[in-house]
Amino acid sequence: MSPVWAADEAPEAFIQRITHETLETIKADKSLRNGDMTKIIQLVDAKLMPHVNFRRMTALATGPAWRKATPEQQKRLQDEFKILLVRTYSGALSQVSDQMVVVKPLRAGQENKNLVVSTEVRGKGDPIQLDYRLEKTPGEGAGWMIFDLNVLGVWLIENYRTQFTKEINAGGIDALVASLAARNKTNAKAP
């Protein structure tokens, strides 16, 4: 896909494309279908993560403390948060079998810097509401970037912001980074 096409892609088409490509890749690969976490993490990193604005996501989740953090603290926090999110999303994808994603029409009047695309994941059981908050990026490599997710009515940023604020208030940014690193280390050992 050329960057020009990506820049002109409608937000619903963007979400439909990346979710469809990811689900089809899983359905076509037996080791992915069987929950091979190493391969699923590689898939998430290759197919989804290039479309996520981790800097904005981390800054929003961290709140006012983000602006007070040094560039090194910001980088470490962003790196650890990315690992956590990749593992979380990969864990959800390891459960994929016959699901399909239905992208709902956009609500009118949304702006390109904070636009919500609503989807429904359908398969066995009740459908799961999954919304993506997007921003349009300008310039070279322009296109849509995800900076928040809403799963079953809970926005990811709000959820982590509550957790992060408690950790920052208790021990500062370094304590939050250490906590995320410890959680990531524990999660890496889990099957």
PLM features per residue range, with description:
Residues R87-I128, R183-P191:
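Surface-exposed, charged secondary-structure patches
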Residues D148-P191:
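Low-complexity, intrinsically disordered terminal/linker segments enriched in charged
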Residues S2-A7:
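Sec/Tat signal peptide C-region and signal peptidase I cleavage site
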Residues P127-N159:
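Short beta-strand edge/turn micro-motifs at domain boundaries
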Residues W66, I83-L84, A108, R122-K124, ...:
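Solvent-exposed loop/turn segments at secondary-structure junctions
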Residues D8-Y89:
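Early exported N-terminus immediately downstream of N-terminal targeting peptides
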Residues Q16, L23-T25, Q78, V102, ...:
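Soluble periplasmic/extracytoplasmic beta-strand elements of cell-envelope proteins
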